[in-house]
């Protein structure tokens, strides 16, 4: 009835069953771990214990024998024209390469935005290929928190997140928590350090796409809520119909033009609630960049301007991607999009620089690895004055305790308000759809006022704060004009390489400000690509930002024409900015 076992030699046990006899050998050694890190200091674990190292399923991008490979997650959060496909993974000859295929909403801050040259390497042994195929089903079910990379408990507020980050975001949006980063707003948020800085953790939540109303579309309560909203909207339509019948003719015409003639994107922009506008603006914020320039201190005039222009060219690419995420911007014509960007690009970059430097008195944070103080600006003629104005405005931001919601509104207002008075300059064409731009501007201004009204202050204090915030824009415009003139003077002295996108923006600004129409420039007037100063360290790190943005020849130096000092000699079309848009 019961199986009888007999001990054999060599540690082999024989068990007799009714169907036959089975031999069980001694336990075999544990299989070789699938992944082994070649870089010291990383935790190594077998696949069957923790699953694959990626967030989702892995896709094979190559075929060949089992051999070591290099695994680098892709970076879909960045603009596609910023990084060519060869930057997403490193591949050797006849080596199978696997990369992550997780959507951008489930990934944390991209590796391309982190300063460092070390790559995460994983090697696959001979027995790993079979185990990898068997582990695909496990990988499909495993999710990680988009904020801290811990194991996700579910889909919360629009992204996969853990219980800790879900509860933290819920507390943050329900209460009035004025978090302040004790460092430079660059704290690392992971499983072990997510509680060290609440301000950076909340910023990370917004960066990965957490939203107040974000939830899965297949939830039943969403359908019930939609039904309730449908009933409410029907009642609102009925009440609006009565108001429309009794309204004066002028108001009636205004209502018809705003509802029927605005288009789908514009009408949805007008009806968007202020809280949703604020969430969209915060989610559109670009990541913090790295200069990756290996220039020794103290800086000279050439090295300083090389650093700044290289960073400006990189930020311009991200600024265009940021503008395209603004609600209603893509519904504008291409002419209006380019017009707004060309008129406000330096103001947008400057307010971003001031916001990054708000918690570091006396410092200007151009990038994670490029932090300058006032004394370092003395190496460039006229730069110390601009540094002083930037530091003074950052001090004013700090004194007003500017909040992230207010910052994103001011930044969008700068972009949209730049085309309000285009008719004042004879060489600048007016916007094709000025009414749509004004509607966008009104919507963002209403969102700013709505946020200020939620502060709990008196009506007088709320009105005073609105005025204080909007008055900052005139100072930023003044700094932008100073910076534009300084950059133009450096360009005329041939002391700094200017990349194609940056030079295109500078030329457009000079053309719009000219007293007479710009002359037609011929192809022969263009200068050859700048190479000598670039080889000395000028464009090593910045070339990646401009090359994939439509620039094919790298930085250029152009000269002022001796016969026409008011006209630049670099091709005056809008090819660079229009190509990106």
From Swiss-Prot:
Alphabetical UniProt keywords: DNA-binding, Lipid-binding, Metal-binding, Nucleus, Receptor, Steroid-binding, Transcription, Transcription regulation, Zinc, Zinc-finger
Hinge: region residues: 211-272
Region forming the signal peptide: none
Molecular function GO labels: hormone binding; nuclear estrogen receptor activity; sequence-specific DNA binding; steroid binding; zinc ion binding
Ranges of Polar residues composition bias in the record: 56-66
Region of interest (Modulating), ranges: 1-144
Basic and acidic residues bias spans: 216-246, 516-528
Residue spans binding DNA: 145-210
InterPro entries: Est_rcpt/est-rel_rcp, Estr_rcpt, Estr_rcpt_N, NHR-like_dom_sf, Nucl_hrmn_rcpt_lig-bd, Nuclear_hormone_rcpt_NR3, Nuclear_hrmn_rcpt, Znf_hrmn_rcpt
Zinc finger residue extent: NR C4-type: 145-165, 181-205
Disordered, as annotated region: 45-66, 96-122, 216-268, 516-581
Gene3D superfamilies xref list: Erythroid Transcription Factor GATA-1, subunit A (3.30.50.10), Retinoid X Receptor (1.10.565.10)
Pfam annotation, one family: Hormone_recep
CDD domains: NR_DBD_ER
Chain ranges of the NR LBD domain: 273-509
Gene Ontology cellular-component terms listed: nucleus
Keyword Plastid attributed: no
Residue ranges with Low complexity bias: 100-109
Localization: Nucleus
Subunit details: Binds DNA as a homodimer. Can form a heterodimer with ER-beta.
Protein family (similarity comment): Belongs to the nuclear hormone receptor family. NR3 subfamily.
Domain remark in the UniProt entry: Composed of three domains: a modulating N-terminal domain, a DNA-binding domain and a C-terminal ligand-binding domain.
Function summary: The steroid hormones and their receptors are involved in the regulation of eukaryotic gene expression and affect cellular proliferation and differentiation in target tissues.
The name this protein goes by in its record: Estrogen receptor
Gene name as annotated: esr1
């Amino acid at each position: 009835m019961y199986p009888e076992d007999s001990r054999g030699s060599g540690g082999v046990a024989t068990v007799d069953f009714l169907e036959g006899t089975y031999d069980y050998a001694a336990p075999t050694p544990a299989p070789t771990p699938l992944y082994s890190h070649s870089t010291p200091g990383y935790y190594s674990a077998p696949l069957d214990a923790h699953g694959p190292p990626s967030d989702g399923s892995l896709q094979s991008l190559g075929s060949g024998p089992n051999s070591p490979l290099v695994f680098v997650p892709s970076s879909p959060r960045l603009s596609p024209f910023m990084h060519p496909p060869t930057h997403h993974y490193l591949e050797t000859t006849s080596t199978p390469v696997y990369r992550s295929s997780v959507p951008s909403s489930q990934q944390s801050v991209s590796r391309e935005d982190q300063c460092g040259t070390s790559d995460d390497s994983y090697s696959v042994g001979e027995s790993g290929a079979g185990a990898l195929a068997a582990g695909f089903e496990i990988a499909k079910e495993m999710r990680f928190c988009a904020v801290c990379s811990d194991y996700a408990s579910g889909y919360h507020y629009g992204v996969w997140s853990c219980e800790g980050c879900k509860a933290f975001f819920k507390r943050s949006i329900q209460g009035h928590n004025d978090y302040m980063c004790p460092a430079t707003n660059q704290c690392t948020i992971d499983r072990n350090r997510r509680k060290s800085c609440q301000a950076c953790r909340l910023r990370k939540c917004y960066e990965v796409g957490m939203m107040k109303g974000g939830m899965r579309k297949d939830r039943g309560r969403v359908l019930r809520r939609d039904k309730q909203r449908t009933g409410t909207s029907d009642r609102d339509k009925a009440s609006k119909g009565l108001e429309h019948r009794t309204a004066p003719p002028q108001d009636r015409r205004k209502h018809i033009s705003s509802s029927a003639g605005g288009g789908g994107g514009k009408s949805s922009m007008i009806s968007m609630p202020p809280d949703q506008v604020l969430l969209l603006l915060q989610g559109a914020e670009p990541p913090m960049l790295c200069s990756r320039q290996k220039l020794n201190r103290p800086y000279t005039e050439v090295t300083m301007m090389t650093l700044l222009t290289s960073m400006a060219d990189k930020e311009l690419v991200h600024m265009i991607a940021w503008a395209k995420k603004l609600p209603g911007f893509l519904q504008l014509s291409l002419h209006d999009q380019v017009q707004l960007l060309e008129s406000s690009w330096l103001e947008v970059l400057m307010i971003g620089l001031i916001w990054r430097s708000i918690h570091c008195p006396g410092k200007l944070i151009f990038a994670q690895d490029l932090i300058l103080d006032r004394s370092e600006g003395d190496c460039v003629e006229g730069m110390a004055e601009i540094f002083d104005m930037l530091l003074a405005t950052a001090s004013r931001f700090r004194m007003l305790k500017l909040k992230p919601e207010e910052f994103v509104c001011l930044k969008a207002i700068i972009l949209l308000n730049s085309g309000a008075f285009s008719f004042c300059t004879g060489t600048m064409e007016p916007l094709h759809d000025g009414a749509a731009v004004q509607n966008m501007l009104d919507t963002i201004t209403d969102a700013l006022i709505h946020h200020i009204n939620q502060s709990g202050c008196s009506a007088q204090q709320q009105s005073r704060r609105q005025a204080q915030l909007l008055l900052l824009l005139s100072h930023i415009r003044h700094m932008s004009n100073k910076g534009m003139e300084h950059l133009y003077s450096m360009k005329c002295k041939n002391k700094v390489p200017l990349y194609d996108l940056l030079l295109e923006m500078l030329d457009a600004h000079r053309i719009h400000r000219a007293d007479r129409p710009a002359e037609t420039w011929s192809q022969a007037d263009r200068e050859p690509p700048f190479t000598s100063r670039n080889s000395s360290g000028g464009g090593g790190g910045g070339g990646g930002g401009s090359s994939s943005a439509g620039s094919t020849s790298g930085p250029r130096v152009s000269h002022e024409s001796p016969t026409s000092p008011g006209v630049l000699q670099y091709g005056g079309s809008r090819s660079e900015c229009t190509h990106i848009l």
